[in-house]
Amino acid sequence: MQIFVKTLTGKTIALEVEASDTIENVKAKIQDKEGIPPDQQRLIFAGKQLEEGRTLADYNIQKESTLHLVLRLRGGVMEPTLEALAKKYNWEKKVCRRCYARLPVRATNCRKKGCGHCSNLRMKKKLR
């Protein structure tokens, strides 16, 4: 039977499958046609994400049904140069010893009125 897979870009892919095919098989066919690795694919049908290990028949997917392909979001890794820049921005500061206001490195007096613009400053402590 023929089913359709619609991507978020609006492209529709036609696939030749059997009702007994597993979701892994469908993802492999999508990889053959589009080059998207199966571990990055999420298939949605009738508002539900299709789980690997189950068949098309388990989800009552029939001929000419349309599945929606969503790519899995990857994240959590920051580029080393960007991480160094973030650390520099967050940790190269001075702190007022009276009111704990964060100040730029070149500051000589506190910017807050509450501590009387004191000059009692220290470098911000680094995390261990």
Swiss-Prot record:
Gene Ontology MF annotations: structural constituent of ribosome
InterPro entries documented for this protein: Ribosomal_eL40_dom, Ribosomal_eL40_sf, Ribosomal_zn-bd, Ubiquitin-like_dom, Ubiquitin-like_domsf, Ubiquitin_CS, Ubiquitin_dom, Ubiquitin_ubiquitin-like
GO biological process, one term: translation
Domain Ubiquitin-like: residue ranges: 1-76
Keywords from the named record: Cytoplasm, Isopeptide bond, Nucleus, Ribonucleoprotein, Ribosomal protein, Ubl conjugation
Cross-link Glycyl lysine isopeptide (Lys-Gly) (interchain with G-Cter in ubiquitin), sequence positions: K48
Cellular component terms (Gene Ontology): cytoplasm; nucleus; ribonucleoprotein complex; ribosome
Pfam family, one: ubiquitin
Annotated crosslink Glycyl lysine isopeptide (Gly-Lys) (interchain with K-? in acceptor proteins) location: G76
Cited CDD domains: Ubl_ubiquitin (cd01803)
Similarity comment text for this entry: In the N-terminal section; belongs to the ubiquitin family. In the C-terminal section; belongs to the eukaryotic ribosomal protein eL40 family.
Record protein name field: Ubiquitin-ribosomal protein eL40 fusion protein
Native species: Trypanosoma brucei brucei
